[in-house]
Amino acid sequence: MSMSDPLGDMLTRIRNALARKKGKLVTPASKLRACVLDVLQSEGYIRGYNQVDLGDGKSEIEIELKYFEGLAAIRELSRVSKPGRRVYVSAKSLPQVANGLGVSILSTPKGIMADHEAREQNVGGELLCRVF
């Protein structure tokens, strides 16, 4: 069975693992997922991730979630641009998440990056998800 929204699947797996207070989770690997996880790690929302090769050209990503005093570092994680409805924003119209406390993740011509990096580089793109 093919998956229509691999990034949405990963975000849902993270939300479900956080709801169950899991320390780690596993998801199929892709370049897009790895780039989004790089941004989440650099912004301090996850401890880290490790790509595991399963052989046969397949690999998985093991994500280590972050908690502080029993509370998850991620309070809200939502997909914005979906396969049926893409959402594009310019550098000037980038929305702030939770008054600047959260972060939006964008796919730009210069790569996957957080909203504050896109503002600094004056570049817009597809608004993938919001994290708070």
Swiss-Prot record:
The keyword Membrane does not apply. SUPFAM superfamilies: Ribosomal protein S8. GO terms for biological process: translation. It comes from the Bacteria. One of its GO terms (molecular function) is rRNA binding. GO terms for cellular component: ribonucleoprotein complex; ribosome. Keywords: Ribonucleoprotein, Ribosomal protein, RNA-binding, rRNA-binding. NCBIfam families: PRK00136.1. One of the primary rRNA binding proteins, it binds directly to 16S rRNA central domain where it helps coordinate assembly of the platform of the 30S subunit. Belongs to the universal ribosomal protein uS8 family. Part of the 30S ribosomal subunit. Contacts proteins S5 and S12. This is Small ribosomal subunit protein uS8. It comes from Bartonella quintana (strain Toulouse). The gene is rpsH.
